[in-house]
Amino acid sequence: MATTNAQIYQQSQMPIPMPTPSLNPNINSAPTPGPNAMSVYEDCQSPLDTSVSGMYPGDRGSRVVSQPAPLLDQSHLRPGNQANLLSHDRTIELYRENAKKTNDPELIFEFSAFMIDAAKAMIPPEQEKDTNPSPALIKQMEKREEIIKEATSLLKRLADRGFPDAQYFLADCYANGIGTARGKQDFDRAFPLFILAAKHGHPDACYRAGTCCEHGWGCRRDSAKAVSFYKKAAVGLHPGAMYRLGTAELNGALGFPRRPKEGVKWLKRSAEHATEEFPHALHELALLHERGIENVVFVDNDYAAELLAQSAELGYAPSAFKLGECYEYGKMGCPVDPALSIHYYNISAQQDHKDACFALTAWYLVGSPGVLPQSDTEAYLWAKKAAELGLAKAQYAVGYFTETGIGIEANPQAALTWYKQAAEGGDKRAAKRLATGSRSSALDRRLEMEALKEEKRLGAANLAQRSGSGSGASGKDGKDGCLIM
């Protein structure tokens, strides 16, 4: 029986935790030892220096002003750098000693996977792009390569002995540029390993082999083979494979005729087994129940909202963004609730969903009594984040903020750069602003916007006073009248 919007609304008062991806989300289980698996460590090269001190970042310090503040900041709950009982280099050494001592293939596989995950975390992404690395960073990079080399060497030996999890994990490494020349994706090496693991019935490998056949990664494109692998993965209840079969049936892709009824069946099966990695079917079913398909899917906003909530709980940014809109504007039968709207927008924005970032800009411009304090600085920072993600209307907004001094010191020259980016992205207001070249109109618009913000704050406060509750009124009512949104 479908949950009502009222029930969803009550349940949603509990905060939804931000999803934390596991270090190794693709491995379901360790391989079963085989009869010839006792010499995996034979002929391995001598142990390497695998000290990985500083592998994990410690506590965040004070927030850099160039980044928007997280709305639900729980950084004070994080452990410090000394929270680990053992240093990571010591952990790797103990792992290695145990693996050598027992020569247990399962333990060796776990050790290899641990080393790969450790290597991934050794260097922050921003330092990866450093064109002039320091000697310390160069040493850390060399150490990381040594760890990856040892791990992939062990995985190769396990894969050669027929361990499907090792075959899949190594293929996944190659597909993501780990253990390859210059860190480039190597599907020519990955695809055969996906095939080997798929022959053992490995669901993830079947799915990945299907994607390779569909897109021609490491092989020629072959829709029939792709469907065959997807169906084999679906037998293993792989949600991604079931979702792809569903969308193919819905849209008439991969050689299927357009069969909405069959497509919906696959989507429902996928939704029943949705995970953080594959929540897509929940979102797609929600959209279908929002608009309906004649004689196939009936319109049911309550059920659609329930599906979106389930998907958002799994951390799917598009679902969280859509729920943010629903609770902002009262769509799909959801009550207007600024707190829930901001909450869901935040979940989405933390995953770099550009429209969600810009939605938070709008909320910060006007604030919400008892929920979110008004802040021009935060409005600017969220707009800047959305602009950097390529949203044209956010680029225009940043130009406007920069020109008129909202949340940042006024700088007309810097504003022109943002206007140009917005115009190139198709924003007509930016093109018009560049054509007129007049700053007076922008200043007039700022005065008008300040008056609009004050009007909204007063209106929201009056409504809250009449209703006896500060959470039932949106300080963002009439946002469409805002001159920059």
From Swiss-Prot:
Domain of life from the UniProt record: Eukaryota
Pfam families for this protein: Sel1 (PF08238)
Localization in the cell: Cell membrane
Topology of this chain in the membrane: Lipid-anchor
Cellular component terms per the entry's GO annotation: plasma membrane
UniProt KW keywords: Cell membrane, Lipoprotein, Membrane, Methylation, Prenylation, Repeat
Name of the featured protein: Chitin synthase regulator 2
Organismal lineage: Eukaryota, Fungi, Dikarya, Basidiomycota, Agaricomycotina
